[in-house]
C-alpha cells in the first residue's frame, strides 16, 4: 500500500497551523482555499522530496518515486520519512518567508525599521535556525538507522569505527 501525500501534508499543516498567512486568502470560498492550500503543499512536497533525496544516506529509497495523479508515493513511507519530508517542507516555507523579508528590506531600505523592527527580524532568523536544526537532527537520526529499525546504518564506516559503535550497543 502506498503512502498518500495527505499523510505528509497533515504533518506539515500541524507545524504551520498558527501561521495565519498560509491560511488567509481573501475573497475565496472555502473550497478555493482548500485547492490553493493543496497546491501550495504539493509545491513544497515536490521541492522537499528532491532535496531530501540528495541528503539521505539510503540510496535504495527514492522519495521522487511518486504517483502525482493518485497523490501517493509508490511505496510505503515509515513515520520518520513522513516527518523528514514534512520538516523539510516547513523549513522551505520559512526560507520563502525569509526571502520576502529580505526583498521588503531591500525595497524599503532604512524605512523597514518602521514596519519590521530589528528584534522581530532577529526572532524570525532564530526561528529559522531552530527549524533547520530540528530538520538536521531528524535527518541525522534517519541516516544513522536502518530503515526497518533493526539497527544502525554503518555504510561507509571503517572497521575500527564499527567496533567502537558495537561497544556502545
Residue ranges and their predicted role:
Residues 1-79, 141-144, 150-169:
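Conserved short "hinge" loops at termini or chain/domain junctions
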Residues 2-5, 35, 52, 84-87, ...:
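Short linear sequence motifs
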Residues 57, 61, 94-106:
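Short, solvent-exposed secondary-structure capping/transition elements
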Residues 69-79, 107-121:
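Short, exposed interaction segments that mediate macromolecular assembly or regulatory contacts
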Residues 78-99:
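Elongated alpha-helical scaffolds
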Residues 83-88, 114-126, 155-169:
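A short, terminal or domain-edge coil/loop segment
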Residues 101-115, 142-157:
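Long amphipathic alpha-helical coiled-coil segments
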Residues 117-153:
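Polybasic, proline/glycine-rich intrinsically disordered low-complexity segments
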Amino acid at each position: 500500500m502506498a503512502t498518500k501525500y495527505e499523510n505528509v501534508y497533515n504533518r506539515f499543516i500541524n507545524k504551520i497551523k498558527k501561521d495565519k498567512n498560509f491560511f488567509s486568502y481573501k475573497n475565496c470560498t472555502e473550497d478555493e482555499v482548500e485547492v490553493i492550500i493543496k497546491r501550495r503543499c504539493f509545491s513544497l512536497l515536490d521541492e522537499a522530496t528532491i532535496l531530501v533525496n540528495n541528503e539521505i544516506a539510503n540510496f535504495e529509497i527514492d522519495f521522487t518515486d511518486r504517483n502525482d495523479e493518485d497523490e501517493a508515493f509508490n511505496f510505503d513511507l515509515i513515520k520518520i520519512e513522513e516527518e523528514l519530508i514534512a520538516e523539510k517542507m516547513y523549513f522551505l516555507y520559512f526560507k520563502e518567508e525569509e526571502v520576502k523579508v529580505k526583498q521588503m528590506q531591500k525595497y524599503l531600505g532604512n524605512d523597514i525599521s518602521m514596519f519590521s523592527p530589528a528584534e522581530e527580524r532577529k526572532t524570525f532568523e532564530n526561528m529559522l535556525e531552530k527549524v533547520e536544526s530540528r530538520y538536521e537532527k531528524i535527518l541525522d537520526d534517519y541516516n544513522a538507522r536502518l530503515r526497518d529499525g533493526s539497527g544502525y546504518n554503518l555504510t561507509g564506516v571503517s572497521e575500527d569505527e564499527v567496533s567502537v559503535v558495537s561497544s556502545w550497543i
